[in-house]
Swiss-Prot record:
It is an enzyme of class 3 (hydrolase). Homohexamer. The keyword Transport does not apply. Keywords: Cytoplasm, Hydrolase, Magnesium, Metal-binding. Mg(2+) 2 binds at D70. InterPro entries: Pyrophosphatase, Pyrophosphatase_sf. This is Inorganic pyrophosphatase. HAMAP family: Inorganic_PPase. CDD domains: pyrophosphatase (cd00412). PANTHER family: INORGANIC PYROPHOSPHATASE (PTHR10286).
Length: 178
């Protein structure tokens, strides 16, 4: 995969997300390697938990932790790692881990991909139980790993998510301009 050919924005309201980990998959953390385009096993998680949503990142972005902006894609089905899915951001999970701030954009597939998410425009439109599962997963998925921790600090709205995406795009452009 030529990641440099995939832009962060599909259009003004849509982002491209490259999936690394399918929802409900085994307790394995995969990471996309930008140099080779391959998906590597980062580690086997010691907790027997599965990701509650498809997990990936927005290409052509850079977050404060030095990685691309992370995204949780709410969907009805697992998405194959390496797939690019067009999404709409609806909010953000605010959290910190042993490396610092580590926000996760919450997104849903675009209407063209799945019209059943058209009514979900903001985080408050999501099922409360799904939000609880997301928080529970991230509060506990590193519990059995040495020197690793996570603290969920709250939720941010759609505007906050869009701001973080724009900052990630700008930060990445600045990196390449310097």
């Amino acid at each position: 995969m030529f990641i440099d050919k995939i832009k962060a924005k599909a259009n003004n309201n849509e982002i491209n997300v490259i999936i690394e980990i399918p929802m409900n998959s085994g307790p394995i953390k995969y990471e996309f390697d930008k140099e080779s385009g391959a998906i590597f096993v980062d580690r086997f998680m010691q907790t027997t938990m599965s990701y509650p949503c498809n997990y990936g990142f927005i290409p052509d972005t850079l977050s404060n932790d030095g990685d691309p902006v992370d995204v949780l894609v709410v969907a009805h089905h697992p998405v194959v790692p390496g797939s690019v899915i067009k999404c709409r951001a609806i909010g953000v999970l605010m959290m910190e881990d042993e490396s610092g701030l580590d926000e996760k954009i919450i997104a849903v597939p675009t209407s063209k991909l799945d019209i059943t998410f058209d009514h979900i425009q903001e985080l408050d439109d999501l099922c409360k139980m799904l939000k609880k599962r997301i928080v529970h997963f991230f509060e506990h998925y590193k519990d059995l790993e040495k020197d690793k921790w996570v603290k969920v600090t709250g939720w941010g709205n759609k505007v906050k998510a869009e701001d973080l995406i724009k900052e990630g795009i700008d930060r990445n452009q600045q990196k390449w301009n310097n």
